[in-house]
């Protein structure tokens, strides 16, 4: 291959690149992209709660937690709480799994297990896990503490939540 042939090959590559660029510019001039985003379907506006107090108020307005606690069944709560054992331990000095251990959770300060790394959403809550706070959290964790790393969707039936809370209260005394 001589110098002339090499020059012809390089010139052909440069010329082809130039043609491709020119065609691209012309295409952009002729065909303007649609910059308007179309929203398909019907969207429903959802009002998100920004604080745990409003989530607690919403939970308290819709159900009377103390009345539910009077009729709560700890044995039924034990069955429902089996879902929790996938990510939590119930043992007194049990290991922290995906979530912190739940030993003596009722009445315990929030984010108080020192060897567990809580999400920022839970760390900033403050207060204690009483019946009302546990009820609101177990009903829908993502509404109670937006940004929590707990991926559990929640327990939909209010009586089931009361049963779980009673089970957690009694579990400490049964051991």
Curated annotation (Swiss-Prot):
Annotated binding of heme c, by residue: 84, 87-88, 150
Post-translational modification: Binds 1 heme c group covalently per subunit.
Localization annotation: Cell membrane
GO molecular function: electron transfer activity; heme binding; metal ion binding
Keyword terms, alphabetized: Cell membrane, Electron transport, Heme, Iron, Membrane, Metal-binding, Signal-anchor, Transmembrane, Transmembrane helix, Transport
Gene3D superfamilies named among the record's database cross-references: Cytochrome c-like domain
Keyword Zinc in annotation: no
Positions on the Cytoplasmic side per record topology: 1-8
Topology with respect to the bilayer: Single-pass type II membrane protein
Cellular component aspect of the GO annotation: plasma membrane
InterPro entries associated with the record: Cyt_c-like_dom, Cyt_c-like_dom_sf, Cyt_c_1A/1B
Predominant place of localization: membrane
Ranges of the Periplasmic topological domain: 30-175
Transmembrane segments: 9-29
Pfam family, one: Cytochrom_C
Family per record: Belongs to the cytochrome c family.
Primary role: May be involved in electron transfer from bc1 complex to aa3.
Entry-linked PANTHER family: CYTOCHROME C
Protein name: Cytochrome c homolog
Source species taxonomy: Bacteria, Pseudomonadati, Pseudomonadota, Alphaproteobacteria, Rickettsiales
């Amino acid at each position: 291959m001589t110098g002339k042939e090499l020059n012809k090959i390089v010139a052909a590559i440069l010329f082809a690149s130039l043609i491709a660029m020119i065609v691209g510019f012309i295409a952009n001039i002729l065909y303007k992209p649609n910059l308007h985003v179309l929203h398909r379907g019907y969207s429903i506006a959802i009002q998100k709660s920004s604080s745990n107090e409003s989530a607690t108020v919403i939970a308290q307005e819709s159900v009377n937690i103390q009345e539910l606690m009077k009729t709560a069944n700890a044995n039924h709560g034990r069955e429902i709480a089996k879902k929790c054992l996938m990510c939590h331990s119930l043992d007194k000095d049990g290991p922290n799994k995906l979530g912190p251990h739940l030993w003596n959770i009722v009445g315990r300060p929030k984010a108080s297990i020192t060897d567990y790394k809580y999400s920022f959403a839970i760390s900033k809550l403050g207060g204690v896990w009483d019946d009302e706070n546990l009820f609101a959290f177990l009903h829908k964790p993502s509404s109670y503490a937006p940004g929590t790393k707990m991926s559990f969707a929640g327990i939909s039936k209010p009586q089931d939540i009361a049963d779980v809370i009673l089970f957690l209260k009694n579990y400490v005394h049964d051991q």
